[in-house]
Regions:
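Feature recognizes metal-dependent phosphohydrolase scaffolds
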Residues: 1-299
């Protein structure tokens, strides 16, 4: 098997992995399923691990995976919450690492889309992934970027385990407020997500207010209040929303412990915790454990 270094040093190998991954990232964990336009239905598992934004932070990714390797090779399912590129110095390597994990452990790994795996009409700032492509592969970077965008468009947006939790990058869409089922709210069965639902899933953040939502200072998505959280969880009869998107030191909670934000790119943001959330199944429920992995600067 080619290593991360070999793949990211050879444009044809990098392109090959990107192209191959477009069909692999939609494979659900064993016992689960996938519904158009990009909803992973998770099976029950003894435990789940949630890894937040990585943003090209290969050192934090290595530290977390080294610490969690027994769970990866055991019975846990690992859900990555998106934002693999932009900001950090090892963006190609970090994206390659998670794609190789999905390729080799596809029944244990879920790769969700973040707002930094953007549609062409909603580019984040910074979006320096194209710059890193161009400095590595000066003659082929435009083609590689288009291939990357094709891959990003195939990444699932949501993972749901009914009766327990919703995992996504930003927040639930406001359609939960007027829907009678989560299938309606998340546009299950459609060929593609509407632009509004996609934007809110990728860009929204929680706010500690007992309201529906406020305008977001990000310029995309919304600030969703407790009423949105409560309605989203009512639709799946669940207990938790698990998300990334915010640069917190490890793991934080909102809405009386119903919303968990996980952030893992510790070195890029000069934080001392690479956050991981672990859910362990016990007595007919999943018990949350916030983990702080101390990052190593060694690669």
């Amino acid at each position: 098997m080619s290593s991360v270094k070999e793949i990211t040093s050879d444009s044809s190998k990098y392109r090959g992995l990107l192209e191959e991954s477009t069909s692999i990232v939609t494979i659900p964990p064993r016992g689960g399923g996938i519904i158009k336009p990009g909803i992973i239905i998770l099976p029950k598992a003894p435990c789940f691990l949630f890894i937040g934004d990585l943003h090209g932070d290969l050192s934090s990714a290595h530290s977390v995976l080294k610490s969690m390797w027994s769970e990866l090779t055991g019975e846990c399912i690992i859900v990555f919450l998106g934002d693999y590129v932009d900001r950090g110095s090892y963006q190609l390597e970090t994206l390659t690492l998670v794609l190789l994990l999905k390729k080799n452990y596809h029944d244990k790994i879920v790769l969700l889309r973040g707002n930094h795996e953007p549609p062409t009409w909603l580019t984040p700032y910074p979006h320096d992934y194209p710059y890193y492509l161009s400095t590595r592969f000066s003659s082929t970077w435009r083609d590689l970027y288009q291939t990357s965008l094709n891959l990003f468009n195939t990444l699932p947006l949501v993972a749901i385990l009914e009766d327990f939790f919703i995992a996504l990058h930003g927040g639930p869409p406001l359609t939960v407020l007027t829907s009678s089922s989560w299938q309606d709210a998340f546009e299950a069965g459609r060929e593609g997500f509407s632009s509004r639902v996609l934007e809110e899933i990728l860009w929204s953040d929680p706010v500690e207010e007992d309201l529906e939502y406020l305008e977001s200072p990000r310029g995309a998505g919304v600030l969703f209040g407790k009423k949105v959280t409560n309605k989203a969880l009512k639709l799946i009869r669940g207990r938790y929303i698990i998300r990334g998107h915010e640069a917190v030191n490890g793991v934080k909670t909102n809405h009386n412990g119903l919303v968990f934000t996980v952030f893992t790119a510790s070195i890029v943001y000069n934080l001392n915790c690479a956050g991981v959330l672990k859910l362990v199944y016990k007595e007919n429920n999943y018990i949350p454990q916030a983990l702080c992995i101390k990052p190593s600067s060694e690669l």
